Amino acid sequence: MTSTAARAGVNRGASILDFILRIVAFLGTLVSAVTMGTTRERLPFFTQFLQFRAEYDDLPTFTFFVVANSIVCAYLVFSLALSVFHIIRSNAKKSRIILIFFDTAMLALLTAGASAAAAIVYLSHKGNAKANWFAICQQFNSFCERISGSLIGSFVGVVVFILLILLSAAALSRR
């Protein structure tokens, strides 16, 4: 086996790993967006003028989280085509550079959405006595479990995007 053939085999293996990681990130962001987007809870008691409920769209941060995860999820669907192209033609250079650029932009968007939502989830669980923000998770238990769980898939997506960027950079440096 020549050096060029060995390098092509390594690049093909990296491209297959890239494809698998993109599927993992797609599933993580999809589950996160759907879980957060369908999160709502109403408390069984209410007054004549007030009904107690919690929905994801009560907070703009959670709406941003759903939109960010949805955009990244849609991007991942389109990027799967380029990933398949890299499996077929493992020496493609320009398309890998394009993927690194857009992967980095999607990493920034996903990190912003997940981090902002994580701050609100923390406040939901712990509150902030100095600001008179009370923890709501004792009352809205199901709501808090779902919003906390939706963060997992999003942060998995963040880690996978970091790995994808490193993998693409390594594949480019071998040329």
UniProtKB/Swiss-Prot annotation:
Q: Which residues lie on this side of the membrane: Extracellular?
A: 37-61, 118-150
Its protein name is Casparian strip membrane protein 1
**Record text on subunit structure and interactions:** Homodimer and heterodimers.
Family as reported in the entry's similarity comment: Belongs to the Casparian strip membrane proteins (CASP) family.
Bilayer topology annotation: Multi-pass membrane protein
This protein's record includes keyword Cell wall biogenesis/degradation: yes
- Which Pfam families would you find in this protein's record? CASP_dom
What the protein does comes down to: Regulates membrane-cell wall junctions and localized cell wall deposition. Required for establishment of the Casparian strip membrane domain (CSD) and the subsequent formation of Casparian strips, a cell wall modification of the root endodermis that determines an apoplastic barrier between the intraorganismal apoplasm and the extraorganismal apoplasm and prevents lateral diffusion.
**Its GO biological process terms?**
cell wall organization
Q: Which domain of life is it from?
A: Eukaryota
An annotated GO cellular component of this protein is: plasma membrane
| Record topological domains on the Cytoplasmic side | 1-15, 83-96, 172-175
- In which broad location class does this protein mainly occur, judging by the first location in its UniProt entry? membrane
